[in-house]
Amino acid sequence: MTFTPATGTESCLSAPSPGNGVGPLQRKIWTATGKADSVDSEEEGQDLESHRPQGQMGNNKSCPGQECSSRFLPAEQAEVNRLFDALSSEKLGSSASPRSFSLQALKGHVGDALPPEMVTRLFEGMRRVDGSGKAKGPSERVSQEQFTASMSHLLKGTAEEKSLVILNMISASGGPVKARDVHKFTEDLVGSVVHVLSYRRQLRGWSQKPPPGSPSRVQVLAAQLCSEMRLQGGGKLLGPQWLDRDCDQAVLEDWVFRAHHVATFLSLVIHQGFLLLRSSLKLATLVPERQVDPQREFASVLDVLSVIYVNSHLPQERRLSWRLLFATELHGNSFAQLCGRIAHGGPCLVLLEDSDGHVFGGFASCSWEVKPQFQGDDRCFLFSVSPRMAVYTCTGYNDHYMYLNQGQQTIPNGLGMGGQHGYFGLWIDVDFGKGHSKAKPTCTTYGSPQLSAQEDFQFQKMEVWAVGEAPKAESVRKTRSILDIDPEARALLEASGRGRHSEGLREVPDEP
């Protein structure tokens, strides 16, 4: 079988662009009855995160392997072929095709890079693809046609094509599955991401596991991804009562479209687990580099999964690196230290862990300034990491995105995001270690619920991470007090008769 590569320029993490010569794709997926359900999907050449793919059900013939593989560039197709040659090189008896590979061969190639359960799921998904349209049932081994078609669907396919492979990774029958089976698949997928990143030494400085005593972030992120699913009848997978509901291919297709992390994680598992087409994986924007002074390491409340999740909601240009600006473990429980380290430090993430173990925070889209007015813009958001993962974006109700003030008698002193004075979605008081998260029922600015375990909370751990490239004023910020940087704040303090006392807010700066 000869596989003809395309001449287009699309990435392995995106759908093919229109006009690249790829026609409608049709393929058959075997069901429990032994009959094939034909499925057509028309390539729309659109970004899956902004346009829903238009799939149609029909009875057309399945595509030949050449059409499936035509999505790969010449160099990519050659790499896919080389991997198949390596997998199918085992010596076989006369009864087996020499151009196919077994589950054992795939496990031997992957080794310990992926959990065995995920390798088995991938093999099951591949062997049930009928690339020729002539098979009478699922094969025991994976042919070159099946392998190429599967890689094409998972790395470059539409939400419909991905959902068909996922369905066969979950179910031996290829038919509808229970929501609990989708949930288990999602946990396996998320766990495989952590596993392979750790195995390939691609954690980029982040911890593989959350701090001791924290809920499993694998389970927390899997629950978040599953909550994006819309079950038959319109319900969401938000609790145990929904686990016995049926999920057919249409439900999975809609889910893959909504929860874009599913497709991203599948691509990551293939790229890093199979060592296939790794140059096309934008790992740097998926897992930001953790930048902390090696002489001043500390135990963060974050792990790699929570970082991946929050990072995916940042503006694209802010996803490459996170630089530590402030941590209570290093810089103490001081509001003055906090202000001095974050003011004019560029866009950043503020997060803390309350005394009940809830981890939450907010993204400040621009530099913090000490002043009595609200600041920021609609790129800001609030988020939760534990016990649940969620991001809450602006509602448009008001512009109370960010607030930072100190030394005033008639207006609140502290750091706040969303809501209003005395009723913030997230508030850190100048009396450091205290705060509140008020939302009845939700924060007006961000639509977020109460983020902390208690409305008024206490905390011991707080971190602030600058995201993306450092601002040009970074060197100024490092050498000057917040009272020097913000003349308005100093003038207000002096006008209130607190000018000399404000000098006491200066603290001997720690080592950066």
Where are these regions (language model features)?
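A positional/structural detector of protein chain ends, strongest at the extreme C-terminus
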Residues: 1-4, 510-512
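N-terminal alpha-helical scaffolding segments that mark the starts
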Residues: 2-3, 8, 12-17, 21-111
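Phosphate-recognition beta-domain surfaces
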Residues: 58-98, 105-130, 146-154, 168, ...
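Extended, amphipathic alpha-helical coiled-coil scaffold segments used for oligomerization/tethering
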Residues: 135-138
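Non-catalytic localization and substrate-recognition regions of ubiquitin/SUMO ligases
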Residues: 141-143
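A short alpha-helix capping/helix-loop junction motif
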Residues: 159-166
